Regions:
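N-terminal "pre-motor" subdomain/linker immediately upstream of P-loop NTPase catalytic cores
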Residues: 1-33
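Catalytic micro-motifs at enzyme active sites that drive phosphoryl/nucleotidyl and oxygen chemistry
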Residues: 2-6, 42-43, 136-138
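A short, glycine/Asx- and small/polar-enriched loop/turn
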Residues: 11, 143-145
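P-loop NTPase catalytic phosphate-binding loop
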Residues: 24-128, 145-148, 154-166
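Conserved alpha-helical scaffold flanking the Walker A/P-loop in AAA+ ATPase domains
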Residues: 115, 119, 133-142
Length: 166
């Protein structure tokens, strides 16, 4: 069983467990992103509007990059803005021939990270100036698209940096 949710009730804790994960798998073409959620399994969604971070870990050859490619394909069908970083110049770097904002060279990676951060801070300031802005709400509440920084092989990037840059 997989623990998929934990909710505190008045006088007890309610756990939601996912059993028979193999039967809950979906095909790649069934992975979809809509309404701030991305479908990962029949009954499992990543609610990126609520939890905008994801760490994918696993052994060599375990399918991490193919999983990321699947996420990218689903997100391309939304109004999201994607930035793809692949310091090993491997599978994700190949996307540069069919889409924008794909980086694999050290200088380009650093520039993308800096630009992404600056745009994030600027967007945050612009959001605070909007009429319908509310503290604690995010871009989705304001009807803005999600922005994703997708980083494959982060450890390889850290190794690529010198001590000063690190």
């Amino acid at each position: 069983c997989e623990l998929t949710d934990k909710e505190l009730k008045d006088s007890y804790v309610e756990y939601t467990l996912l059993y028979d994960t193999i039967a809950s798998r979906i095909s790649i073409d069934e992975v979809e992103a809509k309404d701030g959620k991305l479908r990962l399994m029949k009954n499992v969604w990543w609610e990126y509007d609520k939890l905008p971070h994801m760490l994918i870990a696993g052994g060599t050859g375990g399918g991490k990059t193919y999983f990321i490619l699947t996420l990218i394909e689903a997100l391309l069908h939304t109004d999201s803005k994607l930035y793809i970083l692949d310091p090993k110049n491997a599978d994700l770097a190949d996307l540069g021939s069919v889409m924008a904002n794909v980086y694999y060279r050290k200088e380009d990676l650093l520039s993308c990270i800096e630009t992404f951060y600056e745009e994030m801070m600027k967007r945050s300031e612009e959001m605070k100036q909007m009429k319908n802005y509310k503290t604690g709400k995010n871009y989705a509440y304001l009807g803005l698209p999600a922005h994703f920084l997708i980083f494959d092989e982060y450890v390889a990037f850290m190794e690529m940096l010198g001590t000063k840059e690190n």
